[in-house]
């Protein structure tokens, strides 16, 4: 029997959990021309959700583009990826090359065959520099939208900072503001950076798009999913175990799947029974496997950042009060604020009102057991 749980990759049925309301709302907004800014901490399932939505929209006749800025190392690489995504919707590579070449003068696509004989797109900057204006690249979906509208997704959009971010941001905004047949989705998990781009008056994308925070999946839906996955794969799971998995993982979809998968593997070695002892072994195995990564994360912090992180590990709300500072010997307050801002920017923590949460619950478990 195969493990019924998947993590670490974008998933579809049968591993995709719920999000029915988000699928309906996002699809309706995008089809009406509304652009979106979707944010949440990492591992909440943003990518799986949007890929599923794009798949559905393609079936309805829309053209789609998906660009993950985590993989974009240069302006040239962006142009290559953008052209490649757009060409997927053309009848043939030959027609695609002819069509796009007719619409671009400065940045032209070049098609060659890779080592496996498959077409590969590169670009030729006619001006000789990849610092040339990318406007004609940005404008392609609008120019090609004669019969079909386009949906363009920029994942981890805050990572444009690696591409001379301010200039790239302004160039893109100057183009997309005129696109009447293209809806855009800007997504990101470094929420502090992404929200700054869309909520600060001095930024190019100020108030562009509908802001949407992707929340956690309801725990009852997660519990039903886990119970069904175990039962259908021959695991005798104790009734309270699914809720315990969800609690340990703080209902973060990726980590719920991660622990559920590890517990399934342990149960296979325990006569297909999943109880508290087996779950504890699964947690222990995960922490052991991740120890080098956790140590690296911790050691890259300053001494004060480590001190603040350990305090939040024990108590994660009202962290700027004098009582809190006294309990954990955090002085001065300005240093604590700087350390917290750093922990937010790097994605170790996320903030919900006055509560600060670990984005990786296993990192928190490791800190509590090893450092606190």
Predicted regions and their residues:
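P-loop NTPase nucleotide-binding core
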Residues: 34-35, 41-44, 48-151
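Helix-loop-helix "sensor" segment of P-loop NTPases
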Residues: 196-247, 269-271
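A short, basic N-terminal segment
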Residues: 1-36, 41, 350
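Short, locally clustered residues in the helix-turn-helix/winged-helix DNA-binding domain
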Residues: 30-31, 158, 250, 264, ...
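Conserved C-terminal helix/linker of AAA+ ATPases
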Residues: 266-289
């Amino acid at each position: 029997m195969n493990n019924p749980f998947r993590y670490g990759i974008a998933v579809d049925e049968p591993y995709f959990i719920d999000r029915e309301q988000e699928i309906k709302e996002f699809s309706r907004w995008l089809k009406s021309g509304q652009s979106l800014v979707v944010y949440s901490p990492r591992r909440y399932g943003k990518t799986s959700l949007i890929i599923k939505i794009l798949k559905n929209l393609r079936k309805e006749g829309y053209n789609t583009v998906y660009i993950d800025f985590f993989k974009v190392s240069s302006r040239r690489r962006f142009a290559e990826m953008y052209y490649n995504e757009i060409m997927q919707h053309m009848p043939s590579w030959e027609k695609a090359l002819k069509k796009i070449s007719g619409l671009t003068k400065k940045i032209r696509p070049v098609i060659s065959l890779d080592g496996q004989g498959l077409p590969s797109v590169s670009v030729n900057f006619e001006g000789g520099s990849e610092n040339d204006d990318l406007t004609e690249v940005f404008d392609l979906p609008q120019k090609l939208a004669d019969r079909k509208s386009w949906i363009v997704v920029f994942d981890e959009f805050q990572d444009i900072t690696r591409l001379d971010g301010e200039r790239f941001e302004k160039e893109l905004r100057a183009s997309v503001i005129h696109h009447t047949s293209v809806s855009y989705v800007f997504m990101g998990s470094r929420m502090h950076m992404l929200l700054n781009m869309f909520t600060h008056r001095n930024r190019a994308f100020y108030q562009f798009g509908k802001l949407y925070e992707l929340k956690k999946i309801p725990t009852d839906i997660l519990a039903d999913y886990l119970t069904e996955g175990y039962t259908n794969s021959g695991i005798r799971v104790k009734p309270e175990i699914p809720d315990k998995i969800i609690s340990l993982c703080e209902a973060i979809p990726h980590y719920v799947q991660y622990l559920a998968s590890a517990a399934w593997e342990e149960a296979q070695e325990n006569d297909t029974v999943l109880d508290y002892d087996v779950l504890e072994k699964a947690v222990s195995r995960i922490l052991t496997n991740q120890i080098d990564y956790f140590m690296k994360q911790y050691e890259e912090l300053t001494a004060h950042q480590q001190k603040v992180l350990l305090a939040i590990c024990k108590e994660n709300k009202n962290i700027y009060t004098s009582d809190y500072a006294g309990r954990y010997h955090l002085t001065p307050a300005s240093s604590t604020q700087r350390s917290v801002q750093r922990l937010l920017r790097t994605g170790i923590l996320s903030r919900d009102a006055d509560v600060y949460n670990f984005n990786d619950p296993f990192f928190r478990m490791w800190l509590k057991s090893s450092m606190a």
